[in-house]
């Protein structure tokens, strides 16, 4: 109604190098009224309308989470956004073949999971950063997330929608270990080359399990350990299955401490090769957090004091990284350790991680304000 709700003075200008523009900051934090507003600056004009309220991020959150559903592989999906319908029938129902595991022409079920990208491949290492962050979101915001409705097919009855979506991926991950019970986990499941820009149901070339890698196996351990503790209230038997799979793969890694990359060979799809030090660290952290067993705590604390080897970025002796992604999950390990309520952590290491969390946060804030 054009009534003034708040007035003040902007500060600036401040040059932003990333966009090569001068910007002014309008701080209206004291405004506590909810509703739709606009800024009117004399000599400049009127801004677009914006909303102040408790639920302003709901649309962004639900849209992002619905995106995971639309990335599902092995089932029909359908959604509408801004009046446009997005849908495809079930795809990749022949996943996958074991030719590169020494069993030419043999097919083993590995349907499900999320497509990684437009090539529709499914990658264990890439799943790690995604599943890990989603479970951590549940750790921090369970009281809100358990009430969220994402309008999903009920593929895991009794689970909250948020966890149902994660379980679609963990169901697939449980199909990625070698069938010999060794605990080795295939690095990925893809075609030998990229598919091109086609709909997923038209991608009908054979897709293969690749050889195992230690990074994929360690990430599998971490994800299964997290699944075991977060899914236990909803399905204790499934949680135990996840934990046993994690134990088996962890034992294999302990018996084979050397880094193992998978052989890319005939494959031209994403390699996603990764040093495994951060992955093994994360595996130890999640196994300890889930079980409380001291051998996992010992493994974590021994690894946590070793200077990290990074895929890229500057070397550092700090415990927390500013830049992290699928190829560096070290922060996930550190956060699990520092936020745990379990007893027995090493006071000096705990203090070092806490201090580095704060100093890294301070640097990021300073960079944002620069």
What positions do the PLM features span?
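Glycan-recognition and catalytic cores of secretory/periplasmic carbohydrate-active enzymes
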Residues: 1-7, 12-21, 30-49, 57-370
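Intrinsic-disorder/low-complexity, polar/charged segments enriched in Ser/Thr/Lys/Arg/Asp/Glu/Gln
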Residues: 23-25
């Amino acid at each position: 109604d054009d009534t003034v709700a708040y007035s003040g003075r902007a500060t600036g200008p401040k040059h932003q190098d990333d966009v090569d523009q001068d910007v002014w900051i309008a701080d209206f934090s004291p405004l506590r009224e909810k509703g739709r507003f606009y800024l009117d600056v004399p000599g400049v004009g009127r801004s677009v309308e914006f909303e102040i309220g408790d639920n302003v991020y709901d649309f962004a959150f639900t849209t992002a989470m619905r995106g995971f559903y639309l990335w599902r592989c092995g089932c029909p999906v359908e959604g509408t956004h801004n009046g446009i319908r997005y849908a495809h029938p079930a795809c990749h129902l022949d996943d996958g073949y074991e030719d590169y595991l020494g069993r030419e022409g043999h097919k083993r079920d590995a349907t499900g999971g999320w497509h990684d990208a437009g090539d529709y491949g499914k990658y264990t290492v890439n799943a790690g950063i995604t599943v890990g962050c989603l479970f951590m979101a549940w750790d921090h915001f369970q009281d809100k997330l358990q009430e969220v409705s994402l309008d999903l097919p009920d593929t895991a009855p009794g689970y909250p929608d948020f966890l149902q979506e994660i379980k679609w991926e963990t169901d697939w991950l449980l199909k990625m270990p070698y069938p010999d019970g060794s605990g080795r986990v295939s690095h990925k499941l893809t075609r030998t080359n990229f598919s091109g820009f086609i709909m997923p149901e038209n991608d009908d070339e054979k897709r293969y399990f690749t050889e195992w890698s230690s990074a994929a196996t360690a990430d599998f351990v971490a994800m299964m350990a997290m699944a075991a503790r977060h899914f236990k209230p909803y399905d204790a038997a499934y949680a135990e299955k996840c934990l046993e799979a994690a134990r088996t793969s962890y034992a294999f890694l302990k018996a084979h401490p050397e880094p193992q990359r998978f052989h890319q060979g005939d494959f031209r799809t994403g390699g996603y090769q990764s040093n495994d030090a951060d992955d093994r660290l994360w595996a130890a952290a999640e196994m300890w957090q889930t079980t409380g067993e001291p051998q996992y705590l010992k493994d974590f604390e021994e690894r946590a004091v070793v200077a990290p080897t990074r895929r890229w970025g500057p070397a550092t002796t700090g415990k927390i990284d500013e830049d992290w992604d699928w190829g560096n999950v070290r922060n996930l390990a550190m956060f699990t350790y520092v936020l745990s309520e379990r007893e027995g952590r090493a006071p000096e290491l705990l203090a070092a991680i806490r201090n580095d969390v704060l100093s890294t946060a301070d640097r990021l804030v300073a960079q944002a304000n620069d």
